[in-house]
Amino acid sequence: MVQNDFLDSYDVTMLLQDDNGKQYYEYHKGLSLSDFEVLYGNTVDEIIKLRVDKIS
């Protein structure tokens, strides 16, 4: 079975920290890898933790 990770969907959880030291979570459900790349590239706050779960 050939798997194409670019066609799959992912749930993403990020713990972020702003310039004032405030930490907060962002949740994004059902992202493609392309969507994740855009999200990651556009995140201005520091990523403290990142979790990416493949949706089965």
UniProtKB/Swiss-Prot annotation:
| Gene3D superfamilies attached to this UniProt entry | 6.20.250.30
Record-linked InterPro entries? P56 (IPR049384), UDG_Inhib_phi29likevirus (IPR053744)
Instruction: Tell me the Pfam families matching this sequence.
Output: UDG-inhib_P56 (PF20763)
Domain of life, source organism? Viruses
Summary of subunit composition and partner proteins: Homodimer. Interacts with host UDG; this interaction inhibits the uracil-DNA glycosylase.
The family assignment reads: Belongs to the phi29likevirus protein p56 family.
Q: What is this protein called?
A: Protein p56
State the taxonomy lineage. Viruses, Duplodnaviria, Heunggongvirae, Uroviricota, Caudoviricetes
